[in-house]
């Protein structure tokens, strides 16, 4: 009842609709604070990722900003503006949900303190740093800033949940680490590959590792269990788990500085300084200039948009397919476009008129298979939107709606 004027968009065009399915993608026009309250009953505790790029606070007046909002806030006004929205947004997050907020230097410390108040300091994860431009401002004779910050909090921090960053190369790595406590590890027969001659190697201390029993090597493998003592990274339990997963070990010299090698590369956590390559060698995490070129090629009239690749970096790291992603400062629609291409359900909100022209136009191009941004790296190929189940790209549609007039009238009266 809080929303009205529903229109569904799919590969066949625009259609009026009165039905809203549980997994529909939503684009909502209206005051985002009221929209968040309107969404709370249905989506409380269901959103996996909130990704926002709000209007920034600046120390000095700016002629405009990304979203055509008034960016010349007094600090206190801006903080109240953000606090009201972050408090209700927290209710929408799932218990393992994550919120990311872009910000520049002017207000990063104020925003961090505000988010600690709302999400609690213990749930802070990281302030990621992204190089947002290849052409930093040259007006200052003190420094040339070329980065933005993305503050990350979890609703309830969970050490067992790992974010996905870049994949490591499938090379061997040392099992020894200087400074670790010395302890014994037992390596099962056949799990160590030796690059030294076959034969019998007596117990002793050739270097940093102590051989606690005699070792017999045949055809490049240990034919008996090997007991070693050293400053190892792993416990016996972890070693046993790794062996069961196919990990093997390598001894390259008579010093017996043992190394491990997994059968395939592993996924590391994202780094604080965002890597410029992660999707592919051709398409990495780009800059605002990349976003401008992409939008221009689509005929979208919008300035200061984020590239799809930086949004995709976090969507990939922190969500799985069909998780819900929320952006209540949608702007040109980058978060929605990325979520659509990566098969996440999304809710996008904005109050500006460009949502009906630029944002909807962009999302229609995505539905038709637009190949800019991250499309080629992901091999984005949308399928027939009539297939609502059982297909990876079956959710190739979105529903546009507006805040009901009674709610919007209240906003208009307050702003008058």
Segments from the language model and where they lie:
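Charged, amphipathic alpha-helical linkers/stalks
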Residues: 409-416
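Contiguous mid-protein beta-loop-alpha structural module that forms a pocket-lining wall or clamp
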Residues: 82-83, 111, 116-117, 128-136, ...
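Conserved S-adenosyl-L-methionine
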Residues: 71, 75-79, 108, 308-384
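Class I S-adenosyl-L-methionine
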Residues: 1-324, 356
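Short beta-alpha connecting loops at secondary-structure transitions
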Residues: 131-139, 345-352, 412
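Short, well-ordered loop/turn and helix-capping segments at boundaries between secondary-structure elements
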Residues: 116-121, 130, 155-159, 341, ...
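S-adenosyl-L-methionine
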Residues: 17-38, 364-406
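Short, glycine/acidic-enriched loop or turn micro-motifs at the edges of active sites
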Residues: 34, 56, 330, 353, ...
């Amino acid at each position: 009842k809080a929303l009205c004027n529903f229109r569904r968009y799919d590969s066949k065009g625009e259609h009026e609709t009165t039905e809203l399915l549980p997994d529909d993608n939503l684009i909502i026009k209206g005051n985002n604070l009221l929209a968040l309250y309107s969404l709370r009953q249905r989506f409380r505790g269901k959103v996996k990722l909130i990704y926002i790029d709000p209007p920034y606070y600046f120390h000095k007046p700016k002629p405009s900003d990304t979203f055509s909002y008034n960016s010349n806030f007094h600090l206190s006004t801006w903080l109240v503006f953000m606090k009201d929205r972050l408090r209700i947004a927290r209710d929408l997050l799932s218990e393992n949900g994550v919120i990311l907020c872009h910000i520049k230097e002017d207000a990063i410390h104020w925003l961090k303190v505000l988010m600690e108040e709302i999400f609690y300091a213990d749930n802070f994860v990281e302030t990621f740093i992204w190089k947002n431009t290849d052409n930093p401002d040259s007006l200052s004779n003190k420094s040339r800033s070329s980065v933005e910050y993305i503050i990350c909090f979890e609703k309830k921090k969970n050490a067992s949940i790992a974010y996905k960053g870049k994949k490591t190369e499938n090379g061997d790595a040392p099992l020894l680490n200087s400074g670790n406590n010395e302890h014994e590890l037992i390596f099962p027969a056949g799990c160590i590959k030796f690059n030294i001659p076959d034969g019998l190697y007596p117990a002793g201390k050739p270097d940093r590792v102590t051989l606690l029993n005699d070792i017999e090597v045949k055809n490049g493998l240990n034919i008996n269990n090997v007991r070693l003592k050293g400053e190892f990274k792993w416990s016996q339990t972890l070693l046993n788990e790794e062996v069961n997963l196919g990990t093997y070990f390598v001894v390259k010299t008579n010093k017996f500085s043992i190394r491990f090698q997994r059968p395939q590369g592993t996924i590391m956590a994202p780094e604080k300084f965002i890597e410029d390559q992660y999707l592919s060698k051709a398409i990495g995490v780009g800059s605002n200039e990349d976003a401008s070129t992409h939008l221009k090629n689509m005929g979208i009239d919008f300035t200061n948009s984020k590239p799809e690749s930086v949004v995709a970096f976090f969507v990939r790291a922190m969500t799985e397919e069909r998780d819900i992603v929320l952006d209540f400062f949608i702007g040109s629609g980058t978060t929605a476009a990325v979520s659509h291409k990566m098969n996440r359900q999304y809710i996008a909100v904005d109050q500006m008129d460009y949502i009906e022209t630029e944002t909807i136009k962009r999302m229609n191009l995505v539905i038709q298979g637009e190949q800019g941004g991250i499309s080629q790296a992901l091999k984005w190929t949308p399928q027939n939107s009539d297939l609502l189940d059982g297909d990876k790209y079956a959710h190739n549609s979105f529903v546009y709606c507006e805040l009901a007039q009674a709610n919007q009238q209240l906003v208009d009266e307050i702003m008058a």
